[in-house]
Regions:
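ER/Golgi luminal nucleotide-sugar-dependent glycosyltransferases, focusing on the catalytic module
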Residues: 1-295
Length: 295
């Protein structure tokens, strides 16, 4: 573990740690990651970056970061978070956030989300509570999407916490990782009596309406439009990559990178970007630059 100095120490929320997991195909820290870390710094009294790609932390990021942990790119995010969490002092924090760089943002102030009343009593929480399974044959289990996990002291000091992270093993299969760790963590926590919650709760949200997706339909793009019509009617869906407008309205200040890079649901990406520019002050150049470089 390489300790990094800081040039300044801003006012912070008491006893909160953030473990941020980074991956980049070229081993770089993209400007949108710089932006994210600058936003997280005032919100944490301890900020650790775990990189599955870079061997060194750029000098420009050193003042923002308390610890840097380079590691091999194995085990997806949960193995990386396991290693990052192991660097924290036990019992030193009331809340730990595990966040990855699969999202652009924060697009707007994150502090209201962290203080949201609907999350106040949760032991395990996140930006999105979903019940999407890895296949239609699997049961639908409410779970916190793992790109942003918040965990509070009652859970942090439990036997479940220690047992879960001790048993995290690097998995080669992404679907198995999701089932065993993303879904499995929430399922085990709920079964043990811990409360789980999401700022946007897809498990209680109404179905996607035709009126909501209508602006994304176009006779000029019939195949994309048909894909959107077909997929938006399925339940459950991935709320982070389909109903991004609902997430913003719920106070979730993020946009999934995969929504723009893959566009699984067939959204009008030009409209997404226009809406982003209209609703937020986020620098769209960060998104355009990242997509040009990484595709």
């Amino acid at each position: 573990m390489e300790e990094q100095g800081r040039d300044h120490k801003a006012a912070v929320a008491p006893r909160r740690a953030i473990v941020f997991v980074h991956f980049d195909p070229h081993g770089r820290f993209d400007p949108h990651v710089h932006h994210a870390l600058a936003c997280y710094r005032p919100l944490a009294d301890h900020l650790v970056v775990v990189s599955n790609a870079a061997r060194q932390l750029p000098a420009t990021l050193a003042p923002l970061v308390d610890g840097f942990l380079p590691r091999a790119n194995v085990g997806y995010d949960f193995a990386a978070w396991r290693d990052g969490l192991a660097t924290l002092t036990p019992g030193a924090h009331d809340e730990v956030l595990c966040i990855n760089d699969s999202v652009y943002g924060p697009l707007f102030d994150l502090r209201p989300a962290l203080a949201a009343p609907r999350l106040a009593d949760a032991d395990l929480w996140g930006m999105v509570l979903s019940d999407q399974s890895t296949s239609r044959s699997k049961p639908r289990v409410p779970h916190v999407q793992s790109w942003f996990l918040g965990m509070r002291r009652r859970l942090l000091e439990s036997d479940l916490w220690e047992r879960f992270w001790r048993n995290v093993r690097p998995e080669r299969d992404k679907r198995q990782t999701i089932e065993r760790y993303e879904i499995g963590f929430s399922e085990a926590a709920a079964a043990a009596g811990f409360r789980i919650a999401g700022l946007y709760d897809a498990t209680t949200a109404p179905p996607v309406t035709l009126a909501e997706v209508w602006p994304h339909l176009s006779p000029r793009h019939p195949r994309r439009s048909w894909r959107l019509l077909r997929k938006c009617r399925r339940r459950p869906h991935n709320p982070s990559e389909l109903v991004w407008w609902r997430l913003w309205e719920a106070g979730v200040p993020y946009l999934k990178v995969g929504l723009l890079r893959v566009n699984h649901y067939g959204l009008d990406l030009g409209r997404v970007m226009a809406d982003l520019e209209r609703r937020t002050e986020y620098n769209l150049g960060l998104i355009h630059g990242h997509l040009r470089r990484c595709g």
